[in-house]
């Protein structure tokens, strides 16, 4: 934009950043020859007209630039080298826990602008400030995944902001392990699956178009999974185990009239969360199957480790919250801090070595990433297709 504006300016007229003309009549002379008041008046009037016209032209250029996508490579640099522009990443649930730690890790590099998509605007602003994220590296936007109308409004607001979308991270989650009765989203879906899966499903589908338009070298859509939904692990076999069954509950709308559980069974808050994570991992694979080859977008899921002190467990019984962190630290040794987990998710967002699509990433005890295996159900291609098609109907895309 600066280059375009400069081309409109006559070489004899310099316009500083403030938009003030460098032409000055304070001395009322030119090469030692005094101006008459009449000439000074005419010259000043001409200068003002020139300034107004120039400002109008620059304003038009700014408007055109705002309406177009920012190129991934900035052409104008002091040393003449091409540089990659700052990436733009949307992270849901970025006001606490893993989401906030990831936002911090990315913002600290100075290479990313983080859109913190959160339900509580003020909480997100306070969290960003507390984490030391500088204002130029983040924007808070309202998003309530328990309302499909809110999801659509977020997409509209994001597009109106004029920002490109280079990476989408679906991180937010509801976990209600002690709930005896189901609660529901604005549209009447069981809250855990409605938020963790259906809200993210609609968000991802709508923003896929924006991701595809990005000129960034490595566009990515990342959905956070969980070991608890992966029944080929020890943690995944702790009752109640994830099991989507024949999807009769999902087909029925999860509204409680028949069943609020995906498999059509009795409500169980812990199982509802685990089932939603299976849906997340199935959705990632179906995105990869349908869109990776066509768009070049990397679709991935991950389990960053057990963040035993995260607020995700705030609804658990007090004894669990006391005993679970030391159990993970000293017995299973699967514990990771929020900061470490955030750095791992940030790797999946930005590392050139983690661009393989259709992968479920995990980390070993040496903090090295590797492609993990999903359970039979979480990698069932036919079930992934059915979950996709039923979800399309529930969110109004089919």
UniProtKB/Swiss-Prot annotation:
Subcellular location(s) per record: Plastid, Chloroplast
Catalytic activity: chlorophyllide a + NADP(+) = protochlorophyllide a + NADPH + H(+)
Transit sequence range: 1-64
Keywords, ordered alphabetically: Chlorophyll biosynthesis, Chloroplast, NADP, Oxidoreductase, Photosynthesis, Plastid, Transit peptide
Top-level taxon in the UniProt lineage: Eukaryota
Gene Ontology CC annotation, any one: chloroplast
InterPro entries assigned to the protein according to its UniProt record, in alphabetical order: NAD(P)-bd_dom_sf, Prochl_reduct, SDR_fam
Pathway as given in its UniProt record: Porphyrin-containing compound metabolism; chlorophyll biosynthesis
EC id: 1.3.1.33
Gene3D superfamilies: NAD(P)-binding Rossmann-like Domain
GO molecular-function term, one example from the UniProt record: protochlorophyllide reductase activity
Main location: plastid
A biological process from GO: photosynthesis
PANTHER family assigned: PROTOCHLOROPHYLLIDE REDUCTASE A, CHLOROPLASTIC, PROTOCHLOROPHYLLIDE REDUCTASE C, CHLOROPLASTIC
Record-stated family: Belongs to the short-chain dehydrogenases/reductases (SDR) family. POR subfamily.
Function: Phototransformation of protochlorophyllide (Pchlide) to chlorophyllide (Chlide).
Name this polypeptide is given: Protochlorophyllide reductase, chloroplastic
Record organism: Cucumis sativus (Cucumber)
Organism classification: Eukaryota, Viridiplantae, Streptophyta, Embryophyta, Tracheophyta
């Amino acid at each position: 934009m600066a280059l375009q504006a400069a081309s409109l300016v006559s070489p004899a007229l310099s316009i500083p950043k403030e938009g003030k003309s460098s032409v000055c009549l304070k001395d009322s002379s030119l090469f030692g020859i005094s101006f008459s008041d009449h000439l000074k008046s005419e010259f000043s009037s001409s200068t003002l007209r020139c300034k107004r016209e120039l400002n109008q032209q620059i304003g038009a250029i700014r408007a055109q630039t705002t309406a177009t996508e920012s190129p991934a490579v900035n052409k104008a640099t002091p040393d003449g080298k091409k540089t990659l522009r700052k990436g733009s990443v949307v992270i849901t649930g970025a006001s606490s826990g893993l989401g906030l730690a990831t936002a911090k890790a990315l913002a600290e590099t100075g290479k990313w602008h983080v859109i913190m998509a959160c339900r509580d605007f003020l909480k997100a602003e306070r969290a960003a400030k507390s984490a030391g994220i500088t204002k130029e590296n983040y924007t808070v936007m309202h998003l309530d995944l328990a309302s499909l109308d809110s999801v659509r409004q977020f997409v509209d607001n994001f597009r109106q902001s004029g920002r490109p979308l280079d990476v989408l991270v679906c991180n937010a989650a509801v976990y209600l392990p002690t709930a005896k009765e189901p609660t529901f989203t604005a549209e009447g879906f069981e809250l855990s699956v409605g938020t963790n899966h259906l809200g993210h499903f609609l968000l991802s589908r709508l923003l896929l178009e924006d991701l595809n338009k990005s000129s960034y070298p490595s566009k990515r859509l990342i959905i956070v999974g969980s070991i608890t939904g992966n029944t080929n692990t020890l943690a995944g076999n702790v009752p109640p185990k994830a099991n989507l069954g024949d999807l009769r509950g999902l087909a029925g709308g999860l509204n409680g009239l028949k069943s609020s559980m995906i498999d059509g069974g009795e409500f169980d808050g812990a199982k509802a969360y685990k089932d939603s994570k299976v849906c997340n991992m199935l959705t990632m694979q179906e995105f990869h199957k349908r869109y990776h080859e066509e768009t070049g977008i990397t679709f991935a899921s991950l389990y960053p480790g057990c963040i035993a002190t995260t607020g995700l467990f705030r609804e658990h019984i007090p004894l669990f919250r006391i005993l679970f962190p030391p159990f993970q630290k000293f017995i299973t040794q699967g514990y990771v801090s929020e900061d470490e987990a955030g750095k791992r998710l940030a790797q999946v967002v930005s590392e050139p070595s983690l661009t393989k699509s259709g992968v479920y990433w995990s980390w070993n005890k040496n903090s090295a990433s590797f492609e993990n295996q999903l359970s039979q159900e979480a990698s069932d291609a036919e079930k992934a297709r059915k979950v996709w098609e039923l979800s399309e109907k529930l969110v109004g895309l089919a």
